C-alpha cells in the first residue's frame, strides 16, 4: 500500500522574505561577491522562479533596501552593546570603532553594499539609502559625544565635526577592505591609529 504524501507546511511571505535576504547576502559574501547579482541568479540560488521573487519583494531595489535596514538594525544593536560596557566617552568611541570595523571585516557582502560596490548597477536611490545609513551612524557618534558633558563634565568644541571624522575613518576602513578583497587586516594598525585619535578626547 502506497503511503500518503505528507505535505510540508508552506513558508509565510515573511519567512520567504528572510530567506531571500539570507541568500542575497550569501551571494554578496562569496568570492563572486563583486559580480552583479541578477534576479535570475538570485532566484536560482533561492530555488524559485524569477516571478516568484516578486511575490515577496516588488523589486530588487526593495530587496536591497530591506537588507540595508537589517544591516542598520544589527549594527545599532552591536554599537549599543559596546557603549554600555565603557564608562568613559573615549573608551566607548574606541569600542564602537572596533565593533564597526570588525562587523565590516566579517561581513564582506555588507561592506560591499555600504561602499556602493554592490550597488553600481542598481537604482540610484539605494545610494541615497546608504548615505542615510552613514548619517545615522554619525548621529549616534554625536549623541555619545554630547553625553560627555553630563558624564564627565567636559564638552567638545564641535561634536558634529568630530563625529563626521569618526564616520570617515570607518568608511576608509571599509574601502580598504574592499580594495584588498578582504585580505587586509583592519585591526593590524588599529591601536596606532587610535593613538592618533585619542588626543582629540583629552
Swiss-Prot record:
One of its GO terms (molecular function) is sequence-specific DNA binding. PROSITE patterns: HTH_TETR_1, HTH_TETR_2. GO terms for biological process: cell division; negative regulation of division septum assembly. Residues 14-75 form the HTH tetR-type domain. Pfam families: SlmA-like_C (PF22276), TetR_N (PF00440). InterPro entries: DNA-bd_HTH_TetR-type_CS, Homeodomain-like_sf, HTH-type_Tx_Regulator, HTH_TetR, NO_SlmA, SlmA-like_C. It comes from the Bacteria. Residues 38-57 bind DNA. It is found in: Cytoplasm, Nucleoid. GO terms for cellular component: bacterial nucleoid; cytoplasm. The keyword DNA repair does not apply. Keywords: Cell cycle, Cell division, Cytoplasm, DNA-binding. Required for nucleoid occlusion (NO) phenomenon, which prevents Z-ring formation and cell division over the nucleoid. Acts as a DNA-associated cell division inhibitor that binds simultaneously chromosomal DNA and FtsZ, and disrupts the assembly of FtsZ polymers. SlmA-DNA-binding sequences (SBS) are dispersed on non-Ter regions of the chromosome, preventing FtsZ polymerization at these regions. Belongs to the nucleoid occlusion factor SlmA family. Homodimer. Interacts with FtsZ. This is Nucleoid occlusion factor SlmA. It comes from Haemophilus ducreyi (strain 35000HP / ATCC 700724).
